[in-house]
From Swiss-Prot:
InterPro entries: ATP_synth_csu_bac/chlpt, ATP_synth_F0_csu, ATP_synth_F0_csu_DDCD_BS, ATP_synth_F0_csu_sf, ATPase_proteolipid_c-like_dom, F/V-ATP_Csub_sf. The chain crosses the membrane at residues 7-27, 57-77. It comes from Synechococcus sp. (strain WH7803). GO terms for cellular component: plasma membrane-derived thylakoid membrane; proton-transporting ATP synthase complex; proton-transporting two-sector ATPase complex, proton-transporting domain. It is a multi-pass membrane protein. The record marks E61 as: Reversibly protonated during proton transport. GO terms for molecular function: lipid binding; proton-transporting ATP synthase activity, rotational mechanism. F-type ATPases have 2 components, F(1) - the catalytic core - and F(0) - the membrane proton channel. F(1) has five subunits: alpha(3), beta(3), gamma(1), delta(1), epsilon(1). F(0) has four main subunits: a(1), b(1), b'(1) and c(10-14). The alpha and beta chains form an alternating ring which encloses part of the gamma chain. F(1) is attached to F(0) by a central stalk formed by the gamma and epsilon chains, while a peripheral stalk is formed by the delta, b and b' chains. F(1)F(0) ATP synthase produces ATP from ADP in the presence of a proton or sodium gradient. F-type ATPases consist of two structural domains, F(1) containing the extramembraneous catalytic core and F(0) containing the membrane proton channel, linked together by a central stalk and a peripheral stalk. During catalysis, ATP synthesis in the catalytic domain of F(1) is coupled via a rotary mechanism of the central stalk subunits to proton translocation. It comes from the Bacteria. Its main location: membrane. Belongs to the ATPase C chain family. It is found in: Cellular thylakoid membrane. This is ATP synthase subunit c.
Amino acid sequence: MSDLTSAASVLAAALAVGLAAIGPGIGQGTAAGQAVEGIARQPEAEGKIRGTLLLSLAFMEALTIYGLVVALVLLFANPFAG
């Protein structure tokens, strides 16, 4: 693998993980804040809100895991290296 390909792969892996974490991080913070607000307004709906929140957080976290998988592929099973 050439030095340029290796450097580009490391940079792309870092960008993949970093950018994949930004969106879900913002979304998870917003969702958790709205859930706390909803529970404060309707305490009797706490169980339903919490269940929906946890499911939503799991789906959001999956996006970050996809970014990590892309980064690992670029670092260890690089399709661009000859």
